[in-house]
């Protein structure tokens, strides 16, 4: 990660060589595996406040601000840092629809956001509490007597996905297909794989829209068919863009958080014990784990030349919004690389759900799901650990998360010490 040599290609002429770090951030984080977030924290000591990398997966070079202050400034200035063209999906298909409202700037953005806000209010989420608990308990029932499980497949994927599909009124029986599409769409480094899955998703959504147009129901797509923007019905492209956004946002983010949170608890039995002894602390633990293991990266396009610190960004430059770097900023959080469930989250709010006009509309639902999952696992299962002869696998492409996470716990009558097993597998 040393400054790159003065080479005219592939680095833009306006990027000073001392600000260039010649690596792919997502690939490097993935290679770091379980040490990814510790490595990310070191970037606050080893890189300039804003640096430039020549590649990001299959995406071109981008500026990477690492300070929370700079990232907040960027997110609060959509006129200079635009969300238009944030994702590559429609472009890969040779189409022109937008993920609304994610890829739309103010003031137009507010019109689309207003369509989604009523679906995710605290009151609406509160009404789901018992359904969320029921589903979590059912999934725990399926594994509790086994003594181990593939946590991703047994819980982290089906739990939030089934809740979300129920909320949207989408077919529950298609869950495995939806999960495959979103996982390969968001986490693949292969451009053809991303293109193929984007095409599959758009085909399903268009078919679903046509079916609901002919046979309206009490579901999200039917709701959009009766909604209006500026006194007119939504266009087919607008319907597609909103459904596509809801599809990928609702089917992966909580899954990714659950994998990272439970990996942490499995690796840190003392903090697992802390929450078992004081369940009232779980809400604070969720906030601290959201901060410590943020999962979302976004991009912005510079619309005009702008100066931030010593850096001059030119019109057309890309800027990476890295929530993990913002939330590991030592200027904001003391001992930022340390997970502390008693940290005062309210004193220094994290940016796990982004910031500004594009802040995550589903944050209330996500928090509720994460809290209930942790409460019930800690209440119903004995101390769990990383399963013997398994190694958790981490992926940092797009939305960060665990590719594989096998957990194990002692069944009644098993005299083996969980602590000694944890030590042996660490």
PLM-predicted stretches and their roles:
Residues 1-426:
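Cytochrome P450
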């Amino acid at each position: 990660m040393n400054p790159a040599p003065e080479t005219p290609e592939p680095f833009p002429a306006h990027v000073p060589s001392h600000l260039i770090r010649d690596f792919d951030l997502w690939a490097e984080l993935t290679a770091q595996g379980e040490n990814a977030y510790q490595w990310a924290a070191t970037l606050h000591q080893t890189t300039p406040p804003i640096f430039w990398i020549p590649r990001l997966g299959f995406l071109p070079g981008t500026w990477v601000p690492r300070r929370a202050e700079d990232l907040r400034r960027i997110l609060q200035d959509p006129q200079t840092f635009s969300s238009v063209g944030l994702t590559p999906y429609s472009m890969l298909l040779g189409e022109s629809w937008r993920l609304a409202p994610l890829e739309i700037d103010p003031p137009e953005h507010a019109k689309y956001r207003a369509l989604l806000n009523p679906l995710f209010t605290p009151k609406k989420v509160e009404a789901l509490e018992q359904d969320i608990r029921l589903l979590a308990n059912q999934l725990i029932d399926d594994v509790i007597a086994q003594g181990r499980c593939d946590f991703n497949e047994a819980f982290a994927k089906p739990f939030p996905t089934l809740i979300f599909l129920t909320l949207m009124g989408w077919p529950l029986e298609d869950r495995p297909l939806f999960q495959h599409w979103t996982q390969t769409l968001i986490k693949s480094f292969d451009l053809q794989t991303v293109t193929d899955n984007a095409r599959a998703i758009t085909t399903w959504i268009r078919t679903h829209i046509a079916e609901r147009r002919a046979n309206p129901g009490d579901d999200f797509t039917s709701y959009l068919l009766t909604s209006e923007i500026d006194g007119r019905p939504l266009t087919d492209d607008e319907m597609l863009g909103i459904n596509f956004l809801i599809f990928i946002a609702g089917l992966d983010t909580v899954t990714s958080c659950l994998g990272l949170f439970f990996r942490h608890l499995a690796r840190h039995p003392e903090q697992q014990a802390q929450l078992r002894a004081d369940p009232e602390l779980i809400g604070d633990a969720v906030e601290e784990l959201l901060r410590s293991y943020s999962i979302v990266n976004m991009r912005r396009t510079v619309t005009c030349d702008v100066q931030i610190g010593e850096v001059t960004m030119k019109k057309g430059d890309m800027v990476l919004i890295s929530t993990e770097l913002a939330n590991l900023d030592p200027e904001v959080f003391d001992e930022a690389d340390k997970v502390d469930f008693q940290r005062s989250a309210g004193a220094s709010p994290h940016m796990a759900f982004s910031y500004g006009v594009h802040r995550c509309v589903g944050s209330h639902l996500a928090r509720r799901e994460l809290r209930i999952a942790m409460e019930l696992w800690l209440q119903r299962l004995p101390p769990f650990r990383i399963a013997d002869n398994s190694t958790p696998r981490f992926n940092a492409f797009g939305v960060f998360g665990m590719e594989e996470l096998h957990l194990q716990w002692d069944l009644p009558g098993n005299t083996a010490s969980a602590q000694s097993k944890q030590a042996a597998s660490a």
